[in-house]
Swiss-Prot record:
Listed GO biological process terms: SRP-dependent cotranslational protein targeting to membrane
Name this polypeptide is given: Signal recognition particle 54 kDa protein
Domain of life: Archaea
Location of this chain's protein in the cell: Cytoplasm
């Protein structure tokens, strides 16, 4: 993920300040050098890095920490505020009628981003439509149509036309009933004059309310020139950063934001249309520093529960807080967890669970955990209705039968039963809580954000 190395290395450096009530110049120098190293390796512009370093050094040594604040927390707060300032505000995207035009080089992820954004708007109660104007790239129409179908949104394109400007004009007319028009434009392998001329013509027809530059997180220092030319041509209002699930460094996209004096609008990761989120600087840096993001976590949980309930109208997640917790319920929770997205992203949103704890886990921990969950589902397929309803009734002979039927080891069947028992006990604790108790618990988790945690319901 973008700047992930910075988060990992900085957390380790800040941990060396634990137990100190005062901070020395040597301590600050060590933290600042770690920030410089990580940002420069992430392709952030050197001038930005130097400005940030100077500000952190000055504030850390001159500002008096509030009473009772440790040296680590004092520096952490300053680093947090300065990094939030570095990434900038979020691009305003009002939930109202509007036209958005996407620009960028070929391969930056514009077509996928158009579908993801359309899906996002649809979940906010608006009716979006994608207008595909790319007549340059082979297969562009087919890809866009397929992605729009996955997002379940309106789509317009003309596969036999070679006039992108006319397609844009016709597309807006054909989808006039839509609240939000997302116009996907053609890219090239480089910034060519014909690309700039074409996108300027489309802009004249579309008259977008905002133009977003789509950037691959791996763009590197080339982002500066690209951003400058697109901004001079059509004016860039915001940036959508894509492919954050890869090993990309991501700093070049921050450079582009600074170069165009714009902001970040969306972050994209993964191949599905749901793999998108609005950029929230506070939440982004909070996750980066291992402090969690309860707001984003809550939104993902609510969305995942809704999607899981849509798949099975007889299942109501509120029933979990009332009666017995069965294996059916556990399975639905696992499906909801899967709907939340990659586990490592979810973990980063839990205060005390991301950050330092994630650094300590093996690189394949998330893959192993998801594989175990898939194994659990296979085991449940081999269980009877009575066993699913009352797992406590499952004895040794039944474990042997279930293992044979599922092709899973007997130990894995026992592991599932133990996992269910642990989750059932957790649900009982929640059942006894009032709203005030829940809020106090979540507040405590937020306060403990940087301090590490343990386990994830026994899954690790």
């Amino acid at each position: 993920m973008v700047l992930d190395d910075l988060g990992s290395s900085l957390r380790g450096t800040l941990d060396t300040l634990r137990g100190k009530s005062r901070i020395s110049e040597e301590d600050v120098d060590k933290v600042v050098k770690e920030i410089q190293r990580s940002l420069l390796q992430a392709d952030v512009d050197v001038d930005l890095v130097m400005d940030l370093s100077e500000s952190i050094t000055e504030r850390s040594l001159e500002e008096e920490p509030p009473g009772g604040t440790s040296a680590r927390d004092h520096v952490l707060r300053i680093v947090y505020e300065e990094l939030v300032g570095l990434v900038g505000d979020s691009t305003p995207i009002p939930l109202e009628e509007q036209t958005i035009m996407l620009a960028g080089l070929q391969g930056s992820g514009k077509t996928t981003t158009a579908a993801k954004m359309a899906w996002w708007f649809s979940k906010k109660g608006l009716r979006p439509a994608i207008v595909q104007t790319d007549t340059f790239r082979p297969g562009a129409y087919e890809q866009a149509a397929e992605m729009a179908d996955r997002a379940e949104v309106d789509f317009y394109g003309e596969p036999d036309s070679d006039d992108p400007v006319q397609i844009a004009r016709d597309g807006l007319a054909a989808t006039a009933d839509a609240d939000v028009h997302i116009v996907d434009t053609a890219g090239r392998h480089a910034l060519e004059d014909d690309l700039i001329a074409e996108i300027e013509e489309i802009e004249g027809v579309v008259e977008p309310d905002r133009s977003l530059l789509v950037l691959d997180a791996a763009i590197g220092q080339g982002a500066k020139q690209q951003a400058r030319q697109f901004d001079a041509s059509i004016g860039i209002d915001g940036v959508a950063i894509t492919k954050l699930d890869g090993t990309a460094k991501g700093g070049g996209s921050l450079t582009a934001v600074n170069e165009t004096d714009s902001t970040i609008a969306f972050l994209g990761s993964g191949e599905t249309v749901q793999d998108i989120e609005r950029f929230e600087p506070d939440s982004f840096i909070s996750r980066l520093l291992g402090m969690g993001d309860l707001k984003q976590l809550t939104e993902r949980v609510e969305r995942a529960m809704e999607e899981t309930q849509d798949d099975d109208e007889d299942w109501d997640p509120e029933d979990l807080m009332k009666g017995e917790f069965t294996l059916h319920d556990m399975r639905k929770q696992m499906q909801a967890m899967d709907n939340m997205g990659p586990l490592d992203q979810v973990m980063d949103m839990i205060p005390g669970m991301g950050g330092g704890l994630m650094d300590e886990l093996p690189d394949d921990a998330m893959d192993v955990t998801q594989e175990r969950m898939r194994g659990f589902e296979v085991i449940m397929d081999s269980m009877t209705e009575a066993e699913m309803a009352d797992p406590r009734s499952v004895g040794a002979s039944q474990i042997r039968r279930i293992a044979r039927g599922s092709g899973q080891p007997e130990d894995r069947v026992r592991e599932l039963l133990d996992q269910h028992k642990m989750m059932a006990q957790t649900m009982q604790q929640f059942q006894g809580m009032g709203d005030g108790d829940m809020q106090r618990m979540m507040s405590k988790m937020q306060q403990q954000g940087g301090g590490g945690g343990g386990g994830f319901g026994g899954m690790f």
